Amino acid sequence: MTNIRKTHPLIKIINHSFIDLPAPSNISSWWNFGSLLGLCLMIQIITGLFLAMHYTSDTTTAFSSVAHICRDVNYGWLIRYMHANGASMFFICLFLHVGRGMYYGSYTFMETWNIGVILLFTVMATAFMGYVLPWGQMSFWGATVITNLLSAIPYIGTTLVEWIWGGFSVDKATLTRFFAFHFILPFIITALVIVHLLFLHETGSNNPTGLNSDADKIPFHPYYTIKDLLGALILILSLMTMVLFFPDLLGDPDNYTPANPLNTPPHIKPEWYFLFAYAILRSIPNKLGGVLALILSILILAFLPFLHTSKQRSMMFRPITQVLYWLLVANLLVLTWIGGQPVEHPFIIIGQLASISYFSIILILMPISGIIEDKLLKWSL
């Protein structure tokens, strides 16, 4: 009798994706983050669904409905904080996943990488709209400031902003449509994830050496299922520690004040995972220039395959590029710190220098270091 796992039209897809999938024998824990992102997405969809059952997307009751969830709904506080901190965990995993891809040259899988960049943009859009829903001060002003950036687009800017707002300011129409989009986008993300995996399984996974691993493959199950399970346990442990002991650690106290269009908070800033991009936006005095730099700070990832000059795929054996890579990581941490600081001396100049070095490292220094390393190895003949 043939195994149902290998014959059933639906089960065999799962079999080829998660059970009998040939995987490189040497992929490290940096390859765990894909499955952890899948877990994060599932947690967010489930907790989000239960939150949506009690939430009301009306300006007069949105803030109260979130308070009601936390006070009156059975385990509502748990669901709410799992959802809020789950987003932070999602972004931690995303940044590590992208960082892994950059370090080991996974961006040479063009289709997989480009879908990944689209996924990153989509998740960022979803997180931004989700932050608006509790209708606290930072929700309202964050929505006002970020949507207002579109007014920098020549000619159609102002019309576009008012069209997105559904009026002349961020109001009921804005909140309702943001709720609708925040609800639908995770399902679009899920569809994109399937496409992401589809393209990945066309080529197979990369590995730390960046070399072809066709000669040395092992089945995904049980080797990597058990490895992913360990990662999942660590993720859940970290998330629940955050939720149960430090639920407001990454949140903004201003969001416990109901939205008030007549009172601007002293420092408008987004959630921590957007601070690096926010710092780049603020470092350019021109509005349109800032918006373009903001978009480019993420879109630059799509250009990585074309900026790869080395004959080696991975950075594993490329010490000069490694130094630049870790400088870039440190630089992003500086940008994240600056994004949360007020616009005054010395933070302005630090932010501008960090923004310049961010783009310089990726666009100029890394491609040059790739060429230098090839010359040192006498590979550039």
Swiss-Prot record:
Transmembrane stretches, start-end: 33-53, 77-98, 113-133, 178-198, 226-246, 288-308, 320-340, 347-367
CDD domains cross-referenced by the UniProt entry: cytochrome_b_C (cd00290), Cytochrome_b_N (cd00284)
Protein species of origin: Chrotomys gonzalesi (Isarog striped shrew rat)
Cofactors (names): heme b
Coiled-coil stretches: none
Note: Heme 1 (or BL or b562) is low-potential and absorbs at about 562 nm, and heme 2 (or BH or b566) is high-potential and absorbs at about 566 nm.
Protein name: Cytochrome b
Subcellular localization(s) per the UniProt record: Mitochondrion inner membrane
Disulfide bonds: none
Residues where heme b b566 binds: 97, 196
Textual note on the cofactor: Binds 2 heme b groups non-covalently.
KW Transport (keyword) present: yes
Keywords tagged on the record: Electron transport, Heme, Iron, Membrane, Metal-binding, Mitochondrion, Mitochondrion inner membrane, Respiratory chain, Transmembrane, Transmembrane helix, Transport, Ubiquinone
Xref: InterPro entries: Cyt_b/b6_C, Cyt_b/b6_C_sf, Cyt_b/b6_N, Cytb/b6-like_sf, Cytochrome_b, Cytochrome_b_C_euk/bac, Cytochrome_b_N_euk/bac, Di-haem_cyt_TM
Superkingdom as given in the UniProt entry: Eukaryota
Positions that bind heme b b562: 83, 182
Residues that, per the record, bind a ubiquinone: 201
